[in-house]
From Swiss-Prot:
Name of protein: Proteasome subunit alpha
Gene: prcA
UniProt-listed NCBIfam families: 20S_bact_alpha (TIGR03691)
Any GO molecular function: threonine-type endopeptidase activity
Function: Component of the proteasome core, a large protease complex with broad specificity involved in protein degradation.
Location in or out of the cell: Cytoplasm
Length: 242
């Protein structure tokens, strides 16, 4: 007769958490940061087609680190949720907080009930009329959710990236300031330290005044290589905001 080994629930949860953390730590980092002109989403990502940053709804964007197939399925589910809710009720009823709550429930259910947890970490951002009304939510593999102020750093070298951004970010910083700061932080988080350029970056912006500047309600705008270089060239990446 085969002897069955007992594993405590605490040990099971610890093993799941360790497994997910190791998977996330292998991924390149992402920074989401608020600026005067909007919210910048900056990722180290050399792939031109496998995006880590995406649009969810009018003023809401998504960023992720970890396993691509897992966070891409969550992104698509978020788009469907937002479309259905906006169509069924009102477009103003689609909020980052509501989307983050749905993601938290899904991640928590997978973490506790499925064979393996998702190896992902998510950020949901919603741009407001001013910086005080910006909403940034960070979601971890177990469904935990945090309402962050100013910026979010995620991924493999999160401690060093977070330290650089925290030291340089200030409310009222320009878009060029925060993009340069985020890019510098991503490079500083690498071993050895590297200087990232447009070929290794994926950057998008949630424009605060998209209806005025571009005549559209959709705030999300993905930057091309020329736009990235224009943002980085005046300051040089990694300069702290003044």
């Amino acid at each position: 007769m085969t002897q069955q080994f007992y594993v405590s629930p605490e040990q099971v949860m610890k093993d799941r958490a360790d497994f997910a953390r190791k998977g996330i730590a292998r991924g390149r980092s992402v920074v989401v940061v608020s600026s005067l002109e909007g919210i910048a989403l900056v990722a180290e990502n050399p792939s031109p087609s496998l995006h880590k940053i995406g649009e969810i709804y009018d003023k809401i964007a998504f960023a992720a680190v970890g396993k691509y197939n897992e966070f891409e399925s969550l992104r698509q589910a978020g788009v469907r949720y937002a479309d259905v809710r906006g169509y069924s009720y009102d477009r103003d009823d689609v909020t980052a907080r509501g989307l983050a709550s749905v993601y938290a429930q899904s991640l928590g259910a997978v973490f506790t009930a499925e064979q393996k947890p998702f190896e992902v970490e998510l950020a949901v951002a919603e741009v407001g009329e001013n910086q005080d009304q910006d909403h940034l939510y960070r979601l971890t593999f177990d469904g935990s959710i945090a309402d962050e102020t100013g910026f979010i750093a995620m991924g493999g070298q999160v401690d060093s990236v977070h330290q650089v951004v925290a030291a340089g970010w200030a409310s009222g910083s320009s878009l060029a300031d925060v993009v340069g700061l985020a890019v510098g932080a991503l490079g500083a988080g690498r071993e050895p330290v590297v200087e990232l350029d447009a070929a290794n970056l994926e950057i998008a912006v949630l424009d605060r005044d998209s209806e005025t500047s571009r005549g559209v309600a959709r705030a999300f705008r993905r930057l091309n290589a020329n736009e990235v270089n224009d943002l980085l060239s005046p300051r040089g990446s990694g300069s702290p905001a003044e």
